[in-house]
Curated annotation (Swiss-Prot):
<dbReference type="GO" id="GO:0009423">
    <property type="term" value="P:chorismate biosynthetic process"/>
</dbReference>
<feature type="binding site">
    <location>
        <position position="40"/>
    </location>
    <ligand>
        <name>substrate</name>
    </ligand>
</feature>
<feature type="binding site">
    <location>
        <begin position="18"/>
        <end position="23"/>
    </location>
    <ligand>
        <name>ATP</name>
    </ligand>
</feature>
<dbReference type="GO" id="GO:0005524">
    <property type="term" value="F:ATP binding"/>
</dbReference>
<comment type="subunit">
    <text>Monomer.</text>
</comment>
<feature type="binding site">
    <location>
        <position position="22"/>
    </location>
    <ligand>
        <name>Mg(2+)</name>
    </ligand>
</feature>
<dbReference type="GO" id="GO:0009073">
    <property type="term" value="P:aromatic amino acid family biosynthetic process"/>
</dbReference>
<keyword id="KW-0028">Amino-acid biosynthesis</keyword>
<keyword id="KW-0479">Metal-binding</keyword>
<comment type="function">
    <text>Catalyzes the specific phosphorylation of the 3-hydroxyl group of shikimic acid using ATP as a cosubstrate.</text>
</comment>
<dbReference type="InterPro" id="IPR000623">
    <property type="entry name" value="Shikimate_kinase/TSH1"/>
</dbReference>
<dbReference type="GO" id="GO:0008652">
    <property type="term" value="P:amino acid biosynthetic process"/>
</dbReference>
<keyword id="KW-0067">ATP-binding</keyword>
<dbReference type="Pfam" id="PF01202">
    <property type="entry name" value="SKI"/>
</dbReference>
<feature type="binding site">
    <location>
        <position position="147"/>
    </location>
    <ligand>
        <name>substrate</name>
    </ligand>
</feature>
<feature type="binding site">
    <location>
        <position position="164"/>
    </location>
    <ligand>
        <name>ATP</name>
    </ligand>
</feature>
<dbReference type="GO" id="GO:0005829">
    <property type="term" value="C:cytosol"/>
</dbReference>
Length: 187
């Protein structure tokens, strides 16, 4: 079956934090004439608190419950570009929602590149909690090794963003995306 025969509703972006999901979602939405949504923003708005506060008050399980509910809600909207949280793919229910409602791009990057990006992101420490008690580099390696098979299984396309700029990544996604997603402006 070719990409034109598949009629996905949404374009999902998955990958570890710092890989460029939120930035790329906005660029893709503009090029495809679609709205974009960041799942973490939906969760924070609905909860009225930051992800770090949700983790602190409700534990990771509470956060993942909120994440699943938010994904279900946004998946029912008209076509969007959706930046998923880095761990959204941890739950089978979420992977099923993604598979049944859209086309998914896995933005990947080398651990040292992710660490550098996270160090340069002022919101990371305030907004996103540490998932382990390890150093940032060790945490990235550990979490990525656990999530990689899930990203791989969920993705229709994998892009290594390590040494590429957003324009290159944007072009690759637009060229690979099924024609049923948005109205691409390739100019």
């Amino acid at each position: 079956m070719n990409n034109d025969e598949v009629k996905p509703q949404h374009l999902y972006l998955t990958g570890y934090r710092g890989c460029g999901k939120s930035t790329l979602a906005k660029l893709l939405a503009q090029k495809l004439s679609l709205p974009s949504v960041d799942l973490d923003d939906v969760i924070e708005t609905t909860a009225g608190k930051s992800i770090a506060e949700i983790f602190a008050n409700e534990t990771e399980v509470g956060f993942r419950d909120r994440e699943e509910a938010a994904l279900m809600e946004v998946s029912r909207r008209p076509q969007h570009v959706i930046a998923l949280g880095g761990g959204t793919i941890l739950r089978e229910a979420n992977r099923n929602i993604i598979a049944n409602s859209g086309w998914c791009v896995w933005l990947d990057a080398e651990p040292d590149v992710l660490v550098a990006r996270l160090a340069g992101d002022a919101t990371t420490a305030d907004r996103r909690p540490s998932l382990t008690d390890q150093s940032v580099f060790d945490e990235v390696q550990s979490v990525m090794s656990h999530r990689e098979p899930l990203y791989r299984a969920s993705a229709d396309l994998r892009i290594d963003t390590s040494h590429r700029n957003m324009d290159e990544i944007l072009t690759e996604v637009l060229k690979a995306a099924p024609s049923s997603i948005g109205q691409a402006d390739l100019s």
